[in-house]
UniProtKB/Swiss-Prot annotation:
Gene from which this protein is expressed: dapB
Domain of life: Bacteria
Cross-referenced SUPFAM superfamilies: Glyceraldehyde-3-phosphate dehydrogenase-like, C-terminal domain (SSF55347), NAD(P)-binding Rossmann-fold domains (SSF51735)
Binding, NAD(+): 8-13, 35, 99-101, 123-126
Binding annotation for (S)-2,3,4,5-tetrahydrodipicolinate: 157, 166-167
Entry EC number(s): 1.17.1.8
Entry's family note: Belongs to the DapB family.
GO cellular component, one term: cytosol
Function text: Catalyzes the conversion of 4-hydroxy-tetrahydrodipicolinate (HTPA) to tetrahydrodipicolinate.
Reaction catalysis annotation: (S)-2,3,4,5-tetrahydrodipicolinate + NAD(+) + H2O = (2S,4S)-4-hydroxy-2,3,4,5-tetrahydrodipicolinate + NADH + H(+); (S)-2,3,4,5-tetrahydrodipicolinate + NADP(+) + H2O = (2S,4S)-4-hydroxy-2,3,4,5-tetrahydrodipicolinate + NADPH + H(+)
Pathway field: Amino-acid biosynthesis; L-lysine biosynthesis via DAP pathway; (S)-tetrahydrodipicolinate from L-aspartate: step 4/4
Record-given protein name: 4-hydroxy-tetrahydrodipicolinate reductase
CDD domains cross-referenced by the UniProt entry: DHDPR_N
Length: 268
């Protein structure tokens, strides 16, 4: 049995992750759950927090105290928290699955450095469908080339704090790489006022934050007379949770290195 820990266990995504671990039919088991040290829920049973009933795993406020109790840590929290957790796992030689978004370029370098010592799966989105879309986007960009205008539209719930979403940015990176462009140079984030004619090489991003939208992403390839749209819509966070647990199982026996869901799904 793969021993899995969830950090941010008292949050919405944390509860979904706990449920996904417990749905593996014995292939994995939740052996540690961690949240903020000042949480009033520390000591509560993680299964009860997730609505699953008692499973005998108390919520801890200190990752360092439970590092011997798991093989892989799943982290969907905040960059500042994740970076601290990476150092803990690095010292304890524990694998990680990271779904946190909003990292700066420098922070991503720190993550890559840690992956020299431990195996890490890091992805902007753990949905199988989204990762299939990334493969399709690479193909579409290579086929349609410079003959189309490319726009990326994403929508999420009102509580999401980063924009554009990590998934939208990853989609932009895939398209830009396929076309030999640097996303940092061609991305346009929102438009307002007299913007002038659209430059063909740009990749536009539009962001919506409203209600309880779990996650919608559309990449539009628009040419004269036709357009191609590649869309993914998530209706439940469980799709991300199940993907993360799948990644945790896949990591067993893997050497140190930085992997993503394309590796997990065999899409490379």
């Amino acid at each position: 049995m793969r021993r899995i820990a969830v950090v941010g266990a008292a949050g919405r995504m944390g509860k979904n992750l706990i449920e996904a671990v417990q749905q593996t039919g014995g292939a994995a088991g939740l052996t540690a759950a961690v949240d903020r040290p000042d949480s009033t829920l520390v000591g509560a049973d993680a299964g009860e927090l997730a609505g699953l009933g008692r499973i005998g795993v108390p919520l801890s406020g200190d990752l360092g105290k439970v590092c011997e109790e798991f093989d892989v840590l799943i982290d969907f929290t905040h960059p500042s928290v994740t970076l601290k957790n990476i150092e803990q796992c690095r010292k304890a030689r524990r694998a990680m699955v990271i779904g946190t978004t909003g990292f700066s370029a420098d922070e991503k370098l720190l993550l890559a450095e840690a992956a020299k010592d431990i195996p890490i799966v890091f992805a902007a989105n753990f949905s199988v469908g989204v990762n299939l879309c990334l493969k399709l986007l690479d193909t579409a960009a290579r086929v349609l080339g410079d003959e189309v205008d490319i726009e990326i539209i994403e929508a999420h719930h009102r509580h999401k704090v980063d924009a554009p979403s990590g998934t939208a940015l990853r989609m932009g990176e895939v398209v830009a790489q396929a076309l030999g462009r640097d996303l940092r140079e061609v991305a346009v984030y929102g438009r307002e006022g007299q913007t002038g004619a659209r430059a063909r090489e740009t990749i536009g991003f539009a962001t919506v934050r409203a209600g309880d939208v779990v996650g919608d992403h559309t990449v539009l390839f628009a040419a004269e007379g036709e357009r191609v749209e590649i869309t993914h819509k998530a209706s439940s966070r469980m799709t991300f949770a199940r993907g993360a647990v799948r990644a945790a199982l896949w990591l067993e026996g893997k050497e140190s290195g930085l992997y993503d869901m394309q590796d997990v799904l065999g899409l490379r």
